[in-house]
Amino acid sequence: MYKRQLNNFNKLDSFGVLKYLINTDNYVENSFGLRFQHAALINTDNRLKASKSVTPGFLIAALLWPKLIDASKDKGSLNLRKFFRSMDRIIREQQVLTAVPRKFHGYIKDIWSLQLKLETRLGHQPYKILNHPRFRAAYDFLLLREEAARDSQGMGAWWTEFQKVNRPGKIELLKLLRESRSGPVEKKFGFLEELS
């Protein structure tokens, strides 16, 4: 595991400079927010080392995600109205500290809003999501969230499988998912540890 970005992040924090670049005031040691940001930094390093593409928009989305979650929490779930209203505000507040190029605003908000759609997995929605231009970034983001939240619901594994299988396999996965949900679908978003 390559950790150059994480080491730089930790050095900036130890020198007291990080708070001037990104607001980490209410992060406690070993909190979801810090684990998620660390996972994103390590992921970025691993992608660079493997000569895979990286975009600053993805990393900015990851660094700001804990702040968006904090602004959107409501009784153990996300308040969707707060979630969508907070997106622009979070980016605007970050711009007071560091520049976030306008071309990344839409990219960041797409990744964030796709997190809700990736969690829903109803009807024809998964097929539409697969064709979204930001699907791959949103999927990678979901895997990082799942890792940082220490979640074992298998949502990331489900999406991994859904990408691999052919059309009949996709239909079967959706059928199994539908059968596993008894009664009406509860619209609760976010991983438990992410929301605590």
Whereabouts are the PLM-identified features?
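Conserved, hydrophobic alpha-helical core segments of structured domains
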Residues: 3-174
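Arginine-glycine-rich low-complexity intrinsically disordered regions
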Residues: 177-196
